[in-house]
């Protein structure tokens, strides 16, 4: 949240600005929106089964592993400096609804923190996050193939990082090449 708030305030991001069409957004934006909608479906199912711990773990994994460690880390240069071009606007219009949806999804688990987060995100809104509807699942933006390809990229990256640690090769030291054998086309 603090990353988003800092740059959104500097750039004067307006959530009501005309949305960049999903088809024109970069693949990483479409991936995180797809994953968010998968999360919405899974968290709602966990809540319906009274599996609060499961819902919390799903939200935590999404925020830590996918939003923070992948989306923000890989896309942070899109938020830095320069004018508000389509790419930067797309990044804001992707991260903003992700944060709002997470605040809504996690509100039953962390009521006070999520209420503060929601009210900080949705400026001018005086209604508590507990009075607004849970985010709706949108099947039209879910791309399971894209989610699977990104999961594969994440696994490959994790393995490379583990090998670097084992060989004591600093992550700042570029590798001339890395070969990843592929046994199956999937």
What are the residue ranges of the model-derived segments?
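Hydrophobic residues within the alpha-helices of tandem HEAT/HEAT-like
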Residues: 63-64
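Phosphate/ATP-binding catalytic cores across multiple sugar-kinase/actin-like superfamilies
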Residues: 163
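Short helix-adjacent coil turns
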Residues: 47-54
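Aromatic-lined ligand-binding clefts that engage carbohydrates, nucleic acids, or primary amines
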Residues: 56, 60
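Secretory-pathway-linked proteins and extracytosolic
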Residues: 1-4
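Acidic, turn-prone loop/beta-hairpin segments
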Residues: 11-44, 73-159, 167, 173-184
């Amino acid at each position: 949240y603090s990353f988003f708030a800092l740059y959104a305030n500097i750039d004067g991001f307006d959530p009501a600005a005309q949305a960049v069409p999903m088809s024109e957004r970069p693949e990483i934006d479409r991936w995180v929106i797809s994953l968010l909608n998968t999360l919405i479906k899974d968290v709602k199912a966990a809540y319906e089964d009274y599996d609060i711990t499961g819902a919390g773990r799903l939200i935590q994994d999404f925020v830590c592993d996918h939003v923070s460690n992948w989306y923000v880390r890989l896309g942070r240069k899109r938020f830095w400096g320069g004018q508000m071009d389509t790419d930067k606007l797309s990044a804001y219009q992707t991260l903003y609804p992700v944060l709002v949806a997470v605040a809504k999804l996690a509100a039953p688990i962390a009521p006070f923190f999520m209420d503060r987060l929601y009210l900080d995100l949705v400026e001018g809104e005086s209604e508590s996050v507990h009075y607004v509807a849970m985010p709706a699942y949108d099947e039209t933006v879910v791309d399971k193939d894209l989610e699977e390809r990104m999961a594969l990229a994440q696994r490959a990256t994790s393995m490379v990082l583990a090998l670097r640690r084992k060989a004591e090769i600093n992550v700042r030291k570029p590798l001339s090449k890395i070969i990843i054998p592929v046994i199956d086309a999937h």
